[in-house]
Amino acid sequence: MFSWLKKGGARGQRSEAIRTVTSSLKELYRTKLLPLEEHYRFGSFHSPALEDADFDGKPMVLVAGQYSTGKTSFIQYLLEQEVPGSRVGPEPTTDCFVAVMHGETEGTVPGNALVVDPEKPFRKLNPFGNTFLNRFMCAQLPNQVLESISIIDTPGILSGAKQRVSRGYDFPAVLRWFAERVDLIILLFDAHKLEISDEFSEAIGALRGHEDKIRVVLNKADMVETQQLMRVYGALMWALGKVVGTPEVLRVYIGSFWSQPLLVPDNRRLFELEEQDLFRDIQGLPRHAALRKLNDLVKRARLVRVHAYIISYLKKEMPSVFGKENKKKQLIFKLPVIFAKIQLEHHISPGDFPDCQKMQELLMAHDFTKFHSLKPKLLEALDEMLTHDIAKLMPLLRQEELESVEAGVQGGAFEGTRMGPFVERGPDEAIEDGEEGSEDDAEWVVTKDKSKYDEIFYNLAPADGKLSGSKAKTWMVGTKLPNSVLGRIWKLSDVDRDGMLDDEEFALASHLIEAKLEGHGLPTNLPRRLVPPSKRRQKGSAE
């Protein structure tokens, strides 16, 4: 499905291009944008200054939604692995922000330790206070998916004012902080609970300005039949139209994102296609990371420029001696008029201005006499960055796009979308073999049930002792397991990579399916004790 396994110079050239673009962006920010931010106190009104970790970090995915919509299960489905410290259940189980990141060993890092680590992009979360940091942690685990991206799990959003107050920190502000820095925002909805609570509506409002990053997932859609699903989808679109303040329709993915069998398999084909589309979005994140950083920096630079004009205008209007406090109140009250004046005078788009009401609230706490007047040299440097320096980086980004021959995210559920007959665009290339190191004559754990599996195998009418991929797929789909899981089982079972299953390989596939249906996980590589006896001899002679 994806040509991930092609190797050569393109990967090195792509990485070099990304490093060049990223280092250039860091230099431009430090020399031309940061001085303007510091001069006009941009961090006190908007987001704090960026650090190297903000430029060098892996792409991040933010997963948000109301309680029990399947956020943690969705993450574990992507990783094909449990997250340290996580709990899954119908009640609100995730009560903190969890940064799921790659690490050599499994473990958790508490929030207070996390915000002092210069290699992590979370140092600027410190102002949210100890109450928030006690509800923030990093879960590290060795997982191939996390080598390319990091995932932010969020607390389940409840309904009612009591839960909002009891959090003890500004939940929408924290969401806004993450939204500015992540590459993708996934909003999960439960097909059985489409209500959007006041806090969830407020949380979605905090994401305003980042609609291009938002993807909506209608989860647990296998619990309803086709006609009901159509009505649920319509109700979701209507509800989103009331809380998302854009004329554009958000992309909604429909599916059941966990490793259990589908309860109502009528829409299996739809779920497969929707899952593939969502996976493509996630897989493309590393490839577009440099472009996203450039886009976010330009967005930030335009806001900084407008902020400089606003602050300098307020400074110019302040009296030098008497009546300062009254004048301050007048200026804050007339801020919408001031915005309109600045817009006309400097030919600035209305979309570049911050939220007027929020700006008025923030200005109340500041001393206008400490503001600085307009400094043309700083603004000239910013304009030069936007018009010339950024333009010079675009050819490097185009080169990176053209030379990229792979989707960046591998492992986990992404492996199952490209295995054998479960691939939409034909069979994939060779995959690495399983683990080595056990005795060839060790007992095969599938032997005790092989007679049962043989009966099913021969009822499927194999040709020349082998079952074709299409016949095997028809039988495997009957288990109602998701295609990504069946794809991984196919990868493990087709030991000789011939695109077909003999009786031993079919027995192995059946054994793995039963194990999965009982709630067990799948191995990353096939352990030697699971390799069929005849295939052990073949592998031994090849070596």
Swiss-Prot record:
Residues 153-156 are annotated as: G3 motif. ATP binds at residues 65-72, 220, 258. GO terms for biological process: cilium assembly; cortical actin cytoskeleton organization; endocytic recycling; endocytosis; plasma membrane tubulation; positive regulation of endocytic recycling; positive regulation of myoblast fusion; protein localization to plasma membrane. Residues 55-286 form the Dynamin-type G domain. InterPro entries: DUF5600 (IPR040990), Dynamin_N (IPR045063), EF-hand-dom_pair (IPR011992), EF_Hand_1_Ca_BS (IPR018247), EF_hand_dom (IPR002048), EH_dom (IPR000261), EHD_N (IPR031692), G_DYNAMIN_dom (IPR030381). One of its GO terms (molecular function) is hydrolase activity. The modification Phosphoserine is found at residues 3, 44, 438, 468, 470, 484, 493. It comes from the Eukaryota. GO terms for cellular component: caveola; cytoplasm; cytosol; early endosome; endocytic vesicle; membrane; perinuclear region of cytoplasm; plasma membrane. Homodimer and homooligomer. Interacts with EHD1. May also interact with EHD3 and EHD4. Interacts with MYOF. Interacts with EHBP1. Interacts with FER1L5 (via second C2 domain). Interacts with CAV1 in a cholesterol-dependent manner. Interacts (via EH domain) with PACSIN2 (via NPF motifs); this interaction probably stabilizes the caveolae. This is EH domain-containing protein 2.
